[in-house]
Amino acid sequence: MVADASKGFTFQTYADDDPAAKPDVASDTEMAGFDALLGTTVIVVAHPDDEVIGFGALMQQMRKPVVVFATDGAPHDPYFWKDYGSRDAYAEVRRQEARAALAIAGAEPVFLSDHVAGGIADQELFRRLPQAAEACAKLISEIRPQALLTLSYEGGHPDHDSACFVSVVIGRQTAIPVWEAPLYHRDPDGKGAVQKFHQRSGEEVELKVEAEAMRKKVEMFHTYKSQNLVLDGFRPEIETFRPMANYDFTRRPMPWKLNYELWQWKMSGDEVAQAFADYLHSTELSGEEQRA
């Protein structure tokens, strides 16, 4: 086990796919890869509050954390914003909460909707992939990070999966290493799973949050007053990361019902995966035209 108790963090890795397995000491190679996250890192998430759940403690250790919010956090469906009067008002509340939360961790917020004509609404990222990828790639070229950190491809939310896809595309284009963290998904029996990879690779690094890091992370949680009910379902004391898995984005992440399908949202996992496939096909054609 590798630990720095003075900063409120304990790191451990697992040797196999058994979540109950005894933690191994993190190897020099594993920690060297993980250390890349502690320099200048761009964290690509879908919505304000994703970053606190997945990375609220880790970003406190980064030399220069920059968080890119890929959507404005406000869906078109009035169900989500009716208490705020309008979709725009709700989006502004979420933006201000994000600014306050990231100030606690010393991180810089970047709102991708400011860089895309017409913005990107919550639940719409998979429909705006060309615009989002272009804007995000430009930002990353300006920031020049040592690593990218994003959410897993796990079928919890179409925007989470799209943020993962965009990050992987940019990582491949730039050779910047990409790491991922889980938020939530459904198991085959339909039960919810929170902050756990649906398949372990043995490369996971678990961060146990303690002391001052925990105090700050809890303060960040409390900053997101509009998301209190959502955040109550997550554990602030654990964060888990690994190098990005080799996902096939042209297929849905799991063959069973995805979380947002069980929520009966308007999009399906097949539709989202098709959007990824269409984007990859279009960029391949564009590359061939440029080489011709």
Residue ranges and their predicted role:
Residues 31, 35, 145-150, 194-196, ...:
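Short, well-ordered helical secondary-structure segments
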Residues 1-177, 219, 223, 240, ...:
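Active-site beta-strand->loop->alpha-helix modules in alpha/beta enzyme cores, enriched
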Residues 185-254:
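A conserved mid-domain beta-alpha-beta active-site/ligand-binding segment of alpha/beta enzyme cores
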Residues 72-74, 182-187:
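Short beta-alpha junction loops
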Residues 228-292:
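C-terminal and late-domain segments of enzyme folds
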Residues 183, 190-193, 276, 285:
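Active-site cores that bind ATP or allylic diphosphates and position pyrophosphate for catalysis
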